[in-house]
């Protein structure tokens, strides 16, 4: 699913520098992201985090009817408390983002630990919670996934050195992620972030769009 969505929003040949990304192209990019995934459309209809959480559980139940959701429920509670008071540029409560990331991962029918890590993927970077606390509260596997996503988020991207740096970053991205699930969480994170592209400044929109096309889309297509 992720590869198909990222492929659909490709604005140019992989590896070639995009000379210009117009406002129309940015709008097209956003439209493609949402139109290619019905779940993303459904997410926009939910305002309450609790309703989104129920959507997540329903998604998990579809491929794992007998799943013990206690760990997922705990992760939702911890993530909601950790991100309390934080809002996204869209004005939404921040918890909406990790919930939507988790739903995308559930659409891929990933294991419980990946869903939990999706819910917690920003807590180390954006809150006072530590990797050690995640390992203690959940398990070492979840902590390693969250740590992997956090480290990938620290990779810097210079839009002025696209072609050479993009390939190097893709290699670093894949090398740093010892577990394929880390990459899937990061791709789901970026996919949902593209939904709120319009709330960023024009300069930031171009930066994120180019980064998505040069770094994330090629990786998604390799999976």
Which ranges hold each PLM region?
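Active-site helical microenvironments for divalent-metal-assisted chemistry
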Residues: 2-223
